[in-house]
């Protein structure tokens, strides 16, 4: 038990994480994120070195044949510092729950939702930032946001039938021309300095992503109209919504919430694991994140909210917009009895309602309580879990984040469902790139697990 507790400390539980304590003692007045990191990293390197010396041979868990054939589900095999997924409480960012982040992270003047800049600071340092630190990040990203001309030209020349995620991945890969890390590595550099150049690349990439994403949106859906210029007085999300062409302050608030809650979800999901794996080869952040986006583009990872909207639209066509609970129950049972699933319900890890769903529901109750699509989502929330429990197949009958996000985007006029995964990708950069900085700071090696063939596995089992 003591060893498990020690492992939990390493992974960042709020009440025991030395990293959080160190962060709170690290130049709390500094608004320069790199300076704060420079203070934190040697302490964390020493802490982990001692931990490995004392417990390096400790067995953390067992691996079963089912795990090997089942996508390594539940297998403990990664160290990922920025977030931990609790089956009952949901995601914790450096130990803080989503409700705690909503309450404690700085907000825009007159706003009610957390600023994603603040979450990035928290993910990188383990420390709740001040308003001044968040403002520094907003200005810093605004300074770094300009796109090189070759990337603009490439985006402008993509065919309109090229999927938005393909465009995003290609543009991020092309931004590799700007990599500080790749240049320094080619010239020969001390590995102790890796994290510093990775940090610079991650900051540049996060700054440029809204410009790339907005350009893709304008080219595909707004006849190639200009995204305009970055305003250094505005926060990251506000600049993003301006470049997309949306001026409703409520949509900007939604984007702040969306970009915050989709940012990170532990290290085992496809996009997070991909960036970690590719980064372990010392590929620069642009190449690592582009690979992550190719994983996110897969229908089993990043297309779930799109599938929810398609299903909701089909439901409305078949039973009408003002459907009774009884008719809705019949429709859901017909869906399940035909071998299909109710999209947006269930999760690989969670065993309660996804807190990311809950905070979006609260946003909708506040801003769009009479919207027909939201009312349908709320009605499903009341009915579906009980049916899934009655059916007896689902381990988790509760809604996840994807059951709600598309409805909110549709309400504010963003109806282009093929684009939704791009928004997800912009958000996910905050988490996986924060971790990438720490992966290089802590000297994580090339990832190289052992594989086995089915014949080899059978022989191994027979020998037991």
From Swiss-Prot:
It is found in: Mitochondrion matrix. SUPFAM superfamilies: Citrate synthase (SSF48256). The modification Phosphoserine is found at residue 226. The modification N6-acetyllysine is found at residues 76, 321, 327, 375, 382, 393, 459. Pathway: Carbohydrate metabolism; tricarboxylic acid cycle; isocitrate from oxaloacetate: step 1/2. The modification N6-succinyllysine is found at residues 57, 76, 103, 193, 321, 327, 375, 393, 450, 459. Oxaloacetate binds at residues 356, 428, 448. The modification N6,N6,N6-trimethyllysine is found at residue 395. GO terms for molecular function: acyltransferase activity, acyl groups converted into alkyl on transfer; citrate (Si)-synthase activity; identical protein binding. The active site is at 301, 347, 402. Its EC number is 2.3.3.1. GO terms for biological process: carbohydrate metabolic process; citrate metabolic process; tricarboxylic acid cycle. A motif (SIFI-degron) lies at residues 2-21. Homodimer. NCBIfam families: cit_synth_euk (TIGR01793), PRK09569.1 (NF007128). Belongs to the citrate synthase family. This is Citrate synthase, mitochondrial. It comes from Mus musculus (Mouse). The lineage of its organism: Eukaryota, Metazoa, Chordata, Craniata, Vertebrata. The gene is Cs.
């Amino acid at each position: 038990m003591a060893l498990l507790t020690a492992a939990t400390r390493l992974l960042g539980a709020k009440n025991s994480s030395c990293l959080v304590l160190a962060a709170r003692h690290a130049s709390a007045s500094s608004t320069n994120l790199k300076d704060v990191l420079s203070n934190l990293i040697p302490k964390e390197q020493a802490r982990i070195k001692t931990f490995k010396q004392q417990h390096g041979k400790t067995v953390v868990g067992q691996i079963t044949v089912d795990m090997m054939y089942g996508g390594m589900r539940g297998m403990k095999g990664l160290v990922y510092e920025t977030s931990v997924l609790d089956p009952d409480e949901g995601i914790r960012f450096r130990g803080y729950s989503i409700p705690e982040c909503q309450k404690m992270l700085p907000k825009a003047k007159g706003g009610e939702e957390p600023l994603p800049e603040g979450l990035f600071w928290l993910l990188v340092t383990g420390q709740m930032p001040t308003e001044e630190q968040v403002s520094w990040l907003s200005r810093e990203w605004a300074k770094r946001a300009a796109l090189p001309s070759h990337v603009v030209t490439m985006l402008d020349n993509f065919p309109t039938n090229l999927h938005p995620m393909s465009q995003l991945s290609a543009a991020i890969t092309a931004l590799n021309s700007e990599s500080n890390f790749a240049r320094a590595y080619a010239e020969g550099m001390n590995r102790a300095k890796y994290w510093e150049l990775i940090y610079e690349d991650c900051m540049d990439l996060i700054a440029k992503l809204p410009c790339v994403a907005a350009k893709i949106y304008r080219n595909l859906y707004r006849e190639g109209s200009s995204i305009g210029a970055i305003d250094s007085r505005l926060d990251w999300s506000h600049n993003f919504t301006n470049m997309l062409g949306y001026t409703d302050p409520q949509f900007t608030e939604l984007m702040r919430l969306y970009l915050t809650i989709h940012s990170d979800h532990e290290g085992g999901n496809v996009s997070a694991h991909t960036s970690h794996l590719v980064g372990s080869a010392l590929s620069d952040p642009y190449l690592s994140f582009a690979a992550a986006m190719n994983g996110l583009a897969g229908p089993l990872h990043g297309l779930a909210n799109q599938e929810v909207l398609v299903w909701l639209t089909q439901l409305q066509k078949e039973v009408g917009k003002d459907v009774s609970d009884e008719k809705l129950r019949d429709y859901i049972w017909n869906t399940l009895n035909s071998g299909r699933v109710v999209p947006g319900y269930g999760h690989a890890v969670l065993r309660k309602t996804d807190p990311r769903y809950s905070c979006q529901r609260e946003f909708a109750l506040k801003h769009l309580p009479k919207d027909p699509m939201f009312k349908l989502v709320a009605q499903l929330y009341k009915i579906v879990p009980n049916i899934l429990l009655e059916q007896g197949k689902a381990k988790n009958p509760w809604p996840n984040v994807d059951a709600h996000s598309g409805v909110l985007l549709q309400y504010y006029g963003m109806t282009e469902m093929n684009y939704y995964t791009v928004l997800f990708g912009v958000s996910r950069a905050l988490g996986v790139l924060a971790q990438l900085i720490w992966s290089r700071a802590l000297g994580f090696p090339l990832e190289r697990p052992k594989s086995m063939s089915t014949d080899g596995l059978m022989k191994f089992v027979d020998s037991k």
